[in-house]
Amino acid sequence: MSFSDVLQLAKIGKRDLASILLKEEFGKMQSPEQRVNLCKWIASCFEGLEDYGSAAEWYEMTGLLSLGETSSDSANAIRALPEYEKARAYYTLCDEEEKVELCSSVIAQLNKCFVAS
């Protein structure tokens, strides 16, 4: 099944099935960069579908994966920060207070990484 087929499933309301299929594809990928790019793509797809809760989860996952992408902590922080900021914004829209606080905490830590470097 192609990614466009999976997106079509999401558009017709079969988001649970689409999510399962995307996670299976995600598990097959070896490269951290591929995983980060897939997460960003999935997040933007959910954003386009106005499913902001799912978009937030995928942006948060993108940020998490970005933290381990290279051996440079500061480079990883630079990549992860905008993803956590997007996740926090969408969690805010969805009134997910606990997740907003978690993202805010991670963002504060990432900002400290910039100051330290």
Language model features with spans:
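TPR-repeat structural position
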Residues: 15-16, 32, 52, 77, ...
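Residues that mark the junctions of alpha-helical repeat units in TPR/alpha-solenoid scaffolds
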Residues: 35, 55, 60, 72-73, ...
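N-terminal alpha-helical interaction modules that lie
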Residues: 1-30, 112-117
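Generic helix N-cap/helix-start motif at coil->alpha-helix transitions
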Residues: 1-4, 33-38, 49, 61-62, ...
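"A position-specific structural signal for the A-helix of alpha-solenoid helical repeats
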Residues: 4, 41, 61, 66, ...
